[in-house]
């Protein structure tokens, strides 16, 4: 019995390790996408380039994104219109950088574990 439990514990630890590695990879992908969004100017009504980025990001990961003008959306795997639906909604445009901004607003920078750049803690982070 002890050897079975050890095998189960070992398999559970391996499975958890794989989940953590997958989560780490997803976090890295999300941060990289946010960096790309920060580096791409996207003022209101001029966000076609960030819409392109979001559409490509979703498509490269196997989603079937749709787009109307600069609005991008995708349905989760297993979506069933007959079942209750949860809509996650955000925007990907930014305001004009303020004159008092102390950094290059379009140069994503990580310092002390924090990501700086225009839109990094606004809806850009929510989109990602």
Where are these regions (language model features)?
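Active-site alpha-helical elements of protease catalytic centers
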Residues: 119-128
């Amino acid at each position: 019995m002890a050897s079975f439990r050890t095998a189960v514990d070992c398999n559970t630890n391996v499975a958890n390790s794989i989940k953590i590695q997958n989560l780490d990879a997803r976090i890295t992908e999300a941060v990289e996408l946010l960096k790309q969004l920060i580096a791409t100017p996207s003022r209101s009504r001029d966000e076609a380039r960030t819409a392109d980025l979001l559409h490509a990001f979703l498509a490269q990961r196997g989603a079937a994104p749709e787009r109307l003008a600069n609005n991008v959306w995708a349905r989760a795997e297993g979506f069933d219109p007959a079942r209750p639906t949860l809509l996650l909604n955000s925007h990907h445009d930014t305001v004009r950088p303020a004159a008092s901004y102390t950094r290059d607003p379009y140069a994503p920078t990580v310092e002390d574990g924090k990501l700086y750049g225009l839109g990094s803690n606004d809806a850009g982070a929510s989109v990602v």
